[in-house]
Amino acid sequence: MEERPPENEGPQREPWDEWVVEVLEELKEEALKHFDPRLLTALGNHIYNRHGDTLEGAGELIRILQRALFMHFRGGCNHSRIGQPGGGNPLSTIPPS
């Protein structure tokens, strides 16, 4: 009996670029609940100016938004928008070096 690798019977994975776009959309929606939209627009423009409309730029934006949201939640989210009156400083949770 001839040995063969197992057949790929699992569900098809979606293409990488579609997954990146979906993750970015989810992060953007969550970030808009917590951060000033003007700040997010400025960040998006900065990334676009550096990388254009590329997966590399989307990846950098994903990393930045994940870190910002993590720090925000770690600092105690009160559903405020950082950068607006009543918003907290996300960097206050980092102990001084």
From Swiss-Prot:
<dbReference type="Pfam" id="PF00522">
    <property type="entry name" value="VPR"/>
</dbReference>
<keyword id="KW-0597">Phosphoprotein</keyword>
<dbReference type="GO" id="GO:0042025">
    <property type="term" value="C:host cell nucleus"/>
</dbReference>
<keyword id="KW-0805">Transcription regulation</keyword>
<dbReference type="GO" id="GO:0043657">
    <property type="term" value="C:host cell"/>
</dbReference>
<keyword id="KW-1163">Viral penetration into host nucleus</keyword>
<feature type="modified residue" description="Phosphoserine; by host">
    <location>
        <position position="80"/>
    </location>
</feature>
<keyword id="KW-0946">Virion</keyword>
<keyword id="KW-0010">Activator</keyword>
<keyword id="KW-0014">AIDS</keyword>
<keyword id="KW-0945">Host-virus interaction</keyword>
<dbReference type="InterPro" id="IPR000012">
    <property type="entry name" value="RetroV_VpR/X"/>
</dbReference>
<dbReference type="GO" id="GO:0046718">
    <property type="term" value="P:symbiont entry into host cell"/>
</dbReference>
<dbReference type="GO" id="GO:0044423">
    <property type="term" value="C:virion component"/>
</dbReference>
<protein>
    <recommendedName>
        <fullName>Protein Vpr</fullName>
    </recommendedName>
</protein>
<feature type="region of interest" description="Disordered">
    <location>
        <begin position="78"/>
        <end position="97"/>
    </location>
</feature>
<keyword id="KW-1048">Host nucleus</keyword>
<dbReference type="GO" id="GO:0075732">
    <property type="term" value="P:viral penetration into host nucleus"/>
</dbReference>
<comment type="function">
    <text>Stimulates gene expression driven by the HIV-2 LTR. Prevents infected cells from undergoing mitosis and proliferating, by inducing arrest or delay in the G2 phase of the cell cycle. Cell cycle arrest creates a favorable environment for maximizing viral expression and production.</text>
</comment>
<keyword id="KW-1160">Virus entry into host cell</keyword>
<keyword id="KW-0131">Cell cycle</keyword>
<comment type="subunit">
    <text>Interacts with human UNG.</text>
</comment>
<keyword id="KW-0804">Transcription</keyword>
